[in-house]
Protein backbone atom coordinates (compact mmCIF):
# COMPACT_ATOMS: atom_id res chain seq x y z
CA UNK A 1 0.00 0.00 0.00
CA UNK A 2 1.14 3.52 -0.68
CA UNK A 3 0.50 5.14 2.68
CA UNK A 4 2.21 4.35 5.95
CA UNK A 5 0.00 4.56 9.02
CA UNK A 6 2.06 4.41 12.21
CA UNK A 7 4.66 2.39 10.40
CA UNK A 8 2.17 -0.07 8.90
CA UNK A 9 1.08 -0.20 5.27
CA UNK A 10 -2.48 0.94 4.62
CA UNK A 11 -4.22 0.05 1.62
CA UNK A 12 -17.28 1.90 1.25
CA UNK A 13 -30.51 5.29 5.32
CA UNK A 14 -34.49 6.96 7.01
CA UNK A 15 -34.30 9.92 9.27
CA UNK A 16 -32.02 9.25 12.22
CA UNK A 17 -33.36 6.41 14.33
CA UNK A 18 -32.73 6.60 18.08
CA UNK A 19 -31.76 2.94 18.19
CA UNK A 20 -29.07 3.53 15.55
CA UNK A 21 -26.94 5.53 17.95
CA UNK A 22 -27.77 3.28 20.89
CA UNK A 23 -26.95 0.18 18.89
CA UNK A 24 -23.67 1.66 17.72
CA UNK A 25 -22.60 2.23 21.31
CA UNK A 26 -24.01 -1.10 22.44
CA UNK A 27 -22.36 -3.22 19.77
CA UNK A 28 -19.33 -3.60 22.06
CA UNK A 29 -18.20 -2.69 25.52
CA UNK A 30 -18.55 0.91 26.64
CA UNK A 31 -16.30 3.13 24.48
CA UNK A 32 -13.26 4.60 26.11
CA UNK A 33 -13.25 8.38 26.62
CA UNK A 34 -11.60 10.37 23.86
CA UNK A 35 -8.10 11.61 24.47
CA UNK A 36 -7.80 15.21 25.54
CA UNK A 37 -6.50 16.21 22.13
CA UNK A 38 -9.63 14.73 20.54
CA UNK A 39 -12.15 16.28 22.92
CA UNK A 40 -14.99 18.33 21.44
CA UNK A 41 -14.27 22.01 21.03
CA UNK A 42 -15.95 24.66 23.14
CA UNK A 43 -18.45 24.95 20.32
CA UNK A 44 -19.69 21.45 21.11
CA UNK A 45 -22.42 22.96 23.27
CA UNK A 46 -23.95 24.17 20.01
CA UNK A 47 -24.13 20.67 18.54
CA UNK A 48 -27.47 19.63 17.12
CA UNK A 49 -28.93 16.77 15.11
CA UNK A 50 -27.20 17.94 11.92
CA UNK A 51 -23.82 19.31 13.07
CA UNK A 52 -21.49 17.71 15.60
CA UNK A 53 -18.28 19.55 16.49
CA UNK A 54 -15.10 17.80 17.59
CA UNK A 55 -11.33 18.18 17.41
CA UNK A 56 -8.53 16.49 15.51
CA UNK A 57 -5.54 17.72 17.46
CA UNK A 58 -5.47 21.49 16.83
CA UNK A 59 -8.02 21.28 14.00
CA UNK A 60 -11.70 22.08 14.37
CA UNK A 61 -13.95 19.51 12.70
CA UNK A 62 -17.69 19.12 12.22
CA UNK A 63 -19.71 16.06 11.24
CA UNK A 64 -22.39 17.31 8.82
CA UNK A 65 -25.64 15.40 8.39
CA UNK A 66 -26.93 15.16 4.82
CA UNK A 67 -29.42 12.30 4.84
CA UNK A 68 -30.17 8.63 5.41
CA UNK A 69 -30.74 5.45 3.45
CA UNK A 70 -32.69 2.30 4.35
CA UNK A 71 -31.57 -0.93 2.72
CA UNK A 72 -33.75 -4.00 3.32
CA UNK A 73 -32.16 -7.12 4.71
CA UNK A 74 -32.92 -9.13 1.58
CA UNK A 75 -29.47 -10.24 0.44
CA UNK A 76 -29.66 -8.04 -2.65
CA UNK A 77 -27.70 -4.99 -1.49
CA UNK A 78 -25.70 -5.98 1.59
CA UNK A 79 -24.32 -9.38 2.53
CA UNK A 80 -24.80 -10.61 -1.01
CA UNK A 81 -25.52 -14.33 -1.07
CA UNK A 82 -25.74 -14.65 2.72
CA UNK A 83 -28.87 -16.10 4.40
CA UNK A 84 -31.01 -13.23 5.68
CA UNK A 85 -31.50 -15.12 8.95
CA UNK A 86 -27.74 -15.07 9.52
CA UNK A 87 -27.60 -11.34 8.83
CA UNK A 88 -30.58 -10.75 11.13
CA UNK A 89 -28.89 -12.67 13.95
CA UNK A 90 -25.77 -10.53 13.61
CA UNK A 91 -27.85 -7.35 13.70
CA UNK A 92 -29.94 -8.53 16.65
CA UNK A 93 -26.83 -9.32 18.68
CA UNK A 94 -25.76 -5.69 18.23
CA UNK A 95 -29.19 -4.33 19.16
CA UNK A 96 -29.91 -3.13 15.62
CA UNK A 97 -33.11 -3.62 13.58
CA UNK A 98 -33.09 -6.98 11.82
CA UNK A 99 -35.24 -6.27 8.76
CA UNK A 100 -33.44 -3.19 7.48
CA UNK A 101 -29.94 -1.72 7.48
CA UNK A 102 -29.91 1.98 8.38
CA UNK A 103 -27.12 4.05 6.83
CA UNK A 104 -26.41 7.69 7.57
CA UNK A 105 -24.81 10.12 5.12
CA UNK A 106 -22.45 12.61 6.78
CA UNK A 107 -19.77 14.61 4.98
CA UNK A 108 -16.95 15.96 7.14
CA UNK A 109 -15.81 19.56 7.57
CA UNK A 110 -12.29 20.40 8.79
CA UNK A 111 -10.80 23.85 9.38
CA UNK A 112 -7.05 23.82 8.70
CA UNK A 113 -5.59 27.30 9.06
CA UNK A 114 -6.87 29.45 6.21
CA UNK A 115 -8.31 26.43 4.44
CA UNK A 116 -11.76 24.97 4.99
CA UNK A 117 -11.94 21.34 3.89
CA UNK A 118 -15.01 19.31 3.00
CA UNK A 119 -14.81 15.55 2.61
CA UNK A 120 -17.52 14.38 0.20
CA UNK A 121 -20.71 16.35 -0.40
CA UNK A 122 -23.66 14.08 0.31
CA UNK A 123 -26.48 12.92 -1.94
CA UNK A 124 -28.42 16.13 -2.56
CA UNK A 125 -32.06 15.50 -3.47
CA UNK A 126 -32.01 11.95 -4.84
CA UNK A 127 -35.16 10.20 -3.66
CA UNK A 128 -33.53 6.99 -2.45
CA UNK A 129 -31.24 8.82 -0.03
CA UNK A 130 -33.62 11.35 1.49
CA UNK A 131 -30.61 13.65 1.48
CA UNK A 132 -30.05 17.32 0.82
CA UNK A 133 -29.53 18.52 4.38
CA UNK A 134 -25.88 19.49 3.84
CA UNK A 135 -26.57 23.21 3.17
CA UNK A 136 -28.51 23.46 6.44
CA UNK A 137 -25.80 21.53 8.28
CA UNK A 138 -23.17 23.92 6.96
CA UNK A 139 -25.24 26.86 8.19
CA UNK A 140 -25.44 25.23 11.60
CA UNK A 141 -21.65 24.92 11.51
CA UNK A 142 -21.31 28.61 10.62
CA UNK A 143 -19.77 27.99 7.20
CA UNK A 144 -20.92 29.46 3.89
CA UNK A 145 -20.53 27.34 0.74
CA UNK A 146 -18.33 30.07 -0.72
CA UNK A 147 -15.96 29.60 2.21
CA UNK A 148 -15.05 26.02 1.34
CA UNK A 149 -11.55 25.98 -0.18
CA UNK A 150 -11.01 22.26 -0.81
CA UNK A 151 -13.28 19.28 -1.39
CA UNK A 152 -11.91 15.74 -1.12
CA UNK A 153 -14.03 13.17 -2.94
CA UNK A 154 -13.75 9.53 -1.93
CA UNK A 155 -15.45 8.26 -5.09
CA UNK A 156 -18.05 9.07 -7.70
CA UNK A 157 -21.24 7.54 -6.28
CA UNK A 158 -24.21 9.89 -5.95
CA UNK A 159 -24.29 9.95 -2.16
CA UNK A 160 -20.75 11.40 -2.20
CA UNK A 161 -20.78 13.79 -5.18
CA UNK A 162 -24.48 14.73 -5.22
CA UNK A 163 -23.90 17.98 -3.36
CA UNK A 164 -21.29 19.36 -5.76
CA UNK A 165 -23.95 21.17 -7.79
CA UNK A 166 -26.72 23.50 -6.67
CA UNK A 167 -30.30 22.81 -7.84
CA UNK A 168 -29.79 25.20 -10.77
CA UNK A 169 -26.73 23.27 -11.96
CA UNK A 170 -24.20 25.85 -10.77
CA UNK A 171 -21.26 24.94 -8.58
CA UNK A 172 -22.45 24.62 -5.00
CA UNK A 173 -18.95 25.49 -3.73
CA UNK A 174 -17.65 28.02 -6.28
CA UNK A 175 -14.29 28.68 -4.63
CA UNK A 176 -13.30 25.09 -3.88
CA UNK A 177 -10.71 22.92 -5.56
CA UNK A 178 -12.15 19.42 -6.01
CA UNK A 179 -9.62 16.68 -5.26
CA UNK A 180 -10.10 13.07 -6.36
CA UNK A 181 -7.91 10.30 -7.66
CA UNK A 182 -6.97 10.34 -11.33
CA UNK A 183 -8.50 6.90 -11.76
CA UNK A 184 -11.80 7.99 -10.26
CA UNK A 185 -11.92 11.11 -12.40
CA UNK A 186 -11.28 9.04 -15.52
CA UNK A 187 -14.20 6.83 -14.54
CA UNK A 188 -16.45 9.85 -14.13
CA UNK A 189 -15.41 11.25 -17.50
CA UNK A 190 -16.29 7.93 -19.15
CA UNK A 191 -19.74 7.79 -17.53
CA UNK A 192 -22.37 9.29 -19.85
CA UNK A 193 -24.78 9.72 -16.94
CA UNK A 194 -22.25 11.97 -15.21
CA UNK A 195 -21.67 14.21 -18.25
CA UNK A 196 -23.40 17.29 -16.82
CA UNK A 197 -21.57 17.00 -13.51
CA UNK A 198 -18.22 16.41 -15.19
CA UNK A 199 -18.67 19.43 -17.44
CA UNK A 200 -19.57 21.68 -14.51
CA UNK A 201 -16.78 20.68 -12.16
CA UNK A 202 -13.95 20.02 -14.64
CA UNK A 203 -12.32 23.47 -14.25
CA UNK A 204 -12.12 22.90 -10.49
CA UNK A 205 -10.81 19.34 -10.47
CA UNK A 206 -7.31 18.48 -9.26
CA UNK A 207 -6.43 14.80 -9.59
CA UNK A 208 -3.88 12.85 -7.59
CA UNK A 209 -2.15 9.50 -7.66
CA UNK A 210 -2.85 6.82 -5.04
CA UNK A 211 -1.30 7.55 -1.67
CA UNK A 212 -0.43 11.18 -2.46
CA UNK A 213 0.09 13.77 0.27
CA UNK A 214 -2.47 16.42 -0.67
CA UNK A 215 -1.97 19.01 2.07
CA UNK A 216 1.49 18.50 3.58
CA UNK A 217 1.24 17.36 7.16
CA UNK A 218 -2.56 17.45 7.12
CA UNK A 219 -4.28 15.34 4.42
CA UNK A 220 -2.97 12.21 2.72
CA UNK A 221 -4.89 9.94 0.34
CA UNK A 222 -5.06 6.29 1.37
CA UNK A 223 -5.09 3.62 -1.32
CA UNK A 224 -8.48 1.92 -0.98
CA UNK A 225 -9.69 0.80 -4.39
CA UNK A 226 -12.20 -1.99 -4.94
CA UNK A 227 -15.50 -0.32 -4.16
CA UNK A 228 -14.70 1.73 -7.25
CA UNK A 229 -11.43 1.61 -9.22
CA UNK A 230 -10.24 4.94 -7.82
CA UNK A 231 -11.88 4.97 -4.39
CA UNK A 232 -9.76 6.72 -1.74
CA UNK A 233 -9.87 6.99 2.01
CA UNK A 234 -8.13 9.97 3.64
CA UNK A 235 -5.87 10.32 6.65
CA UNK A 236 -6.20 13.69 8.42
CA UNK A 237 -3.34 14.58 10.76
CA UNK A 238 -2.69 17.27 13.35
CA UNK A 239 0.36 16.76 15.52
CA UNK A 240 0.10 13.30 17.05
CA UNK A 241 -3.63 13.03 16.37
CA UNK A 242 -5.03 11.32 13.30
CA UNK A 243 -8.46 10.66 11.85
CA UNK A 244 -9.11 8.12 9.11
CA UNK A 245 -11.95 9.14 6.78
CA UNK A 246 -13.34 5.83 5.50
CA UNK A 247 -15.39 6.80 2.48
CA UNK A 248 -17.21 3.62 1.43
CA UNK A 249 -14.64 1.19 2.77
CA UNK A 250 -17.34 0.04 5.20
CA UNK A 251 -21.03 0.92 4.93
CA UNK A 252 -22.73 -0.57 7.99
CA UNK A 253 -21.40 -0.41 11.54
CA UNK A 254 -22.25 -4.06 12.21
CA UNK A 255 -22.37 -6.02 8.96
CA UNK A 256 -19.41 -4.37 7.20
CA UNK A 257 -17.24 -4.46 10.31
CA UNK A 258 -18.00 -7.83 11.85
CA UNK A 259 -18.12 -9.54 8.46
CA UNK A 260 -15.71 -7.61 6.21
CA UNK A 261 -15.70 -10.50 3.73
CA UNK A 262 -19.38 -9.88 2.97
CA UNK A 263 -19.78 -7.57 0.02
CA UNK A 264 -22.34 -5.04 -1.18
CA UNK A 265 -23.97 -4.75 -4.57
CA UNK A 266 -22.08 -1.55 -5.36
CA UNK A 267 -18.57 -2.97 -4.93
CA UNK A 268 -17.28 -2.87 -8.51
CA UNK A 269 -14.46 -5.32 -7.74
CA UNK A 270 -15.88 -7.36 -4.88
CA UNK A 271 -12.81 -9.51 -4.07
CA UNK A 272 -10.53 -6.46 -4.03
CA UNK A 273 -13.02 -4.44 -1.96
CA UNK A 274 -13.22 -7.25 0.60
CA UNK A 275 -9.44 -7.43 0.83
CA UNK A 276 -9.01 -3.66 1.14
CA UNK A 277 -11.73 -3.50 3.79
CA UNK A 278 -10.09 -6.15 5.95
CA UNK A 279 -6.63 -4.59 5.50
CA UNK A 280 -7.79 -1.10 6.44
CA UNK A 281 -9.88 -2.22 9.41
CA UNK A 282 -7.03 -4.40 10.67
CA UNK A 283 -4.46 -1.59 10.51
CA UNK A 284 -6.83 0.89 12.12
CA UNK A 285 -7.59 -1.58 14.91
CA UNK A 286 -3.93 -2.45 15.43
CA UNK A 287 -2.89 1.20 15.59
CA UNK A 288 -5.92 2.47 17.54
CA UNK A 289 -6.56 5.01 14.80
CA UNK A 290 -9.61 7.19 15.28
CA UNK A 291 -12.09 6.75 12.43
CA UNK A 292 -14.74 8.85 10.71
CA UNK A 293 -17.28 6.52 9.11
CA UNK A 294 -19.46 8.29 6.56
CA UNK A 295 -22.37 5.85 6.75
CA UNK A 296 -22.30 4.72 10.39
CA UNK A 297 -24.79 6.18 12.93
CA UNK A 298 -24.27 9.94 13.22
CA UNK A 299 -21.76 11.41 13.90
CA UNK A 300 -19.73 8.39 12.76
CA UNK A 301 -16.80 8.81 15.15
CA UNK A 302 -15.11 5.88 16.82
CA UNK A 303 -12.53 3.14 16.55
CA UNK A 304 -12.30 -0.45 15.40
CA UNK A 305 -11.29 -3.19 17.80
CA UNK A 306 -10.25 -6.72 16.94
CA UNK A 307 -12.74 -9.38 18.05
CA UNK A 308 -11.58 -12.90 17.29
CA UNK A 309 -11.01 -13.15 13.54
CA UNK A 310 -13.08 -10.04 12.90
CA UNK A 311 -13.70 -6.54 14.24
CA UNK A 312 -16.21 -4.48 16.18
CA UNK A 313 -17.08 -0.78 16.02
CA UNK A 314 -16.69 1.25 19.22
CA UNK A 315 -18.53 4.55 18.84
CA UNK A 316 -17.49 7.65 20.76
CA UNK A 317 -21.12 8.52 21.47
Model-derived regions: residue spans:
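Metallo-beta-lactamase
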Residues: 14-135, 139-143, 147, 172-228, 240-247, ...
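Active-site metal-binding motif and surrounding structural segment of the metallo-beta-lactamase
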Residues: 105, 113, 128-179
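Divalent metal-coordination and catalytic microenvironments
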Residues: 58, 110, 120, 148, ...
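Histidine-centered catalytic micro-motifs
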Residues: 151-161, 224-231, 292-299
Amino acid sequence: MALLLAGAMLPGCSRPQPDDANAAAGATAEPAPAAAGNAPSEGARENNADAFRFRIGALDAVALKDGDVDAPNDGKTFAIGQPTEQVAALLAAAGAPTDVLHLSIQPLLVRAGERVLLFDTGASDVEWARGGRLPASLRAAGVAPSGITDIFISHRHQDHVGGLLAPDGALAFPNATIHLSATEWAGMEADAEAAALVSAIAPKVATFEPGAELIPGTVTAVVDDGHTPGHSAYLITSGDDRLLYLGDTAHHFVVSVQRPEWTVAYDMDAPLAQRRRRELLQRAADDGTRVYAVHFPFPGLGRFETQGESFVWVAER
